Regions:
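Surface-exposed binding/hinge segments that line
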Residues: 78, 121-187
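N-terminal lobe/hinge region of extracytoplasmic solute-binding protein
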Residues: 30-81, 111, 206-207
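Ligand/substrate-recognition segments at binding pockets and active sites
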Residues: 218, 353-420, 461, 489
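Extracytoplasmic/peripheral linker and loop segments enriched in polar/acidic and small residues
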Residues: 326, 393-402, 427-496, 527-530
Length: 530
């Protein structure tokens, strides 16, 4: 009995000592390159979204495993009549500077996001709120008429223009975080900046999240626990060190000797010593080309259809692990629809002949980022379309300026990789709604919009998915996009010694849940020095 008690005592001591050491350990990661844009109203790429899970919090946060909304700055919420939402803000919710976060904080933050002069990327996701779309588009001048009110200091009142079951899922996104009043106007400064080139031009948010910025340089971003965070006692890692400028060789070496815990890059996979750490998973993301349907040469759906019929899809999609024929990655329960895959050169030529176009009308300007990858795809399309008498011009734009350039009207075909911001078809379909800030294609279809609006009120998710699949069929049927591939996420992380991190469809891993756990080594395996 004494031996058993001694063994139990030693076991408890070992766990206690590990726990004590664990609470002092820093997390070292490299998931983004360059100086990140950290204003929640203007941040756009996946690396920035991940960093903002540490610095900015809204009413809800993603569950790290299921991606379902978990109460964050709102401790509870209620819905009455399907369209009146009340969110109760936590009494101990504060920014890092100690200022309270109230219902009015969210009113000001969301109205700032909707500012019609800002054209902020995710603002249109709030169009389900009374008056939001009209205010965002400049039709409604009085922002006080938008259905976002502070009913009291702690209660945020939101009225929607339709029943929308999945509103909490949308509100997990960083764009709907609490923003400190003194930093609201800064969003306008960054609204037309695609990439921060110099540190002096960067933005440091006053944190509403689990961590705050301790140091920000061109090479690293150091985050420490926010002592004013409402849930600070459950945040286990005291400091996160993000390396912003690591070469491939540095990344490999630092990971293999244990100086980096998490890498997000695919060019190092073969050199990782412990291949258990390589996590490759399907991502709710699609690579595709889209037509600028407002362009005089591209506005005719028949001409677009001819171009699609002339595309050799096997050649265009070769080498991709998961080839895409539709816009939306096939979620569980989402109906299978007819994809874009028909190659019929004769039919394409017949359409071109019937349209009786002149030489200038048979020209397509392809705008792509400067990269060998996109140039190869553009060459395939150019060669294919030349067979039906269509000439192409390829415009190369630096990656730093590319995505902002898609707002212009100097091209006919652009490309993008889109990662769903929440695990729902609407995360993709939103980009093609008539008044969406994300709609670079300029495609407008009122039947498409009618289906989207009707789906908001549908409570049966299968019926809702059926409705949304009809909307996607409309989009594909009008030859607006050329799907290429569904993306994979690549994360190199030892999930046997790091807990709270799970592979998921949108590759978002809220930092507040990540922690070190007792390692589970593989017998005979050692870390490599090189």
């Amino acid at each position: 009995m004494k031996n058993k008690l001694l063994a139990l005592f030693l076991l408890l001591i070992s766990f206690y000592l590990f726990s004590q050491e664990d609470q002092k350990k820093e997390l070292n990661i490299s998931i983004s390159s360059g100086i990140p844009m950290l204003h929640p109203h203007t941040a756009f790429d996946a690396g920035e979204a991940q960093i903002l899970t540490a610095l900015c919090e809204g009413l809800f946060v993603y569950d790290p495993y299921t991606l379902q909304p978990v109460p964050a700055l709102a401790e509870k919420h209620s819905v009455s009549g399907g369209r009146t939402w009340r969110f109760t803000i936590r009494k101990d919710a504060k920014f890092e500077n100690g200022k309270p976060i109230t219902a009015q904080t969210f009113v000001d933050s969301w109205l700032n996001l909707l500012n019609p002069t800002g054209n902020h990327p995710y603002a249109s996701l709030l169009d389900c709120i009374d008056g939001a779309a009209d205010y965002r588009n400049g039709k409604l001048k009085n922002k006080n008429q938008v259905g976002i009110k502070a009913e009291s200091g702690q209660v945020l009142l939101v009225t929607t223009n339709t029943e929308i079951e999945h509103l909490p899922n949308i509100l997990c996104h960083h764009a709907f975080s609490a923003v400190e009043a003194s930093q609201l106007e800064a969003a306008l400064k960054f609204s037309n900046i695609e990439r921060i080139e110099k540190l002096k031009d960067s933005f440091k948010p006053i944190s509403s999240g689990a961590y705050k910025i301790n140091k920000f340089s061109e090479k690293e971003l150091i985050l420490v626990k926010n002592e004013h965070y409402w849930d600070k006692d459950n945040v286990q890692i005291p400091q996160i060190n993000l390396f912003l400028d690591l070469s491939k060789e540095e990344a490999i070496e630092k990971f293999n000797i244990g100086k980096i815990h998490w890498l997000s890059r695919s060019d190092v996979i073969s050199k990782i010593g412990d291949q258990r750490c390589v996590n490759i998973d399907p991502l709710f993301a699609t690579d595709y080309f889209f037509f600028k349907t407002s362009s005089p040469n591209i506005k005719d759906a028949e001409f677009r259809n001819a171009l699609l019929l002339a595309v050799p899809y096997e050649e265009l999609r070769k080498g991709y692990p998961i080839k895409a024929e539709t816009l939306i990655f096939p979620l569980a329960g989402y109906p299978k629809i007819q994809g874009v895959n028909e190659y019929n050169l004769q039919k394409a030529q017949e359409i071109i002949d019937k349209l009786n176009l002149n030489e200038e009308q048979k020209k397509v300007v392809i705008k792509i980022p400067e990269s060998t990858y996109y140039q190869e795809l553009a060459e395939i399309l150019s060669a294919a379309w030349s067979k039906i008498g269509v000439k192409t011009e390829v415009k190369l734009i630096s990656l730093n300026a590319y995505y902002n350039s898609l707002k212009s009207n100097d091209y006919d075909l652009g490309t993008i990789t889109w990662i769903g911001d929440f695990a729902d078809p609407l995360a993709f379909l939103e980009m093609f709604r008539p008044n969406s800030n994300l709609n670079d294609s300029d495609w407008k279809n009122q039947e498409f919009e009618r289906i989207i609006l009707k789906s908001h009120a549908e409570k049966d998710f299968k019926k809702r998915y059926e409705m949304l699949s009809k909307a996607e069929e409309l989009l594909l049927g009008e030859s607006v996009i050329i799907p290429i591939s569904y993306r994979l996420s690549v994360n190199i992380i030892d999930i046997y010694s790091i807990g709270g991190w799970y592979s998921n469809a949108i590759d978002i891993h809220p930092f507040k849940f990540i922690k070190f756990i007792k390692p589970q080594p593989v017998p005979g395996l050692v870390k490599l020095n090189k």
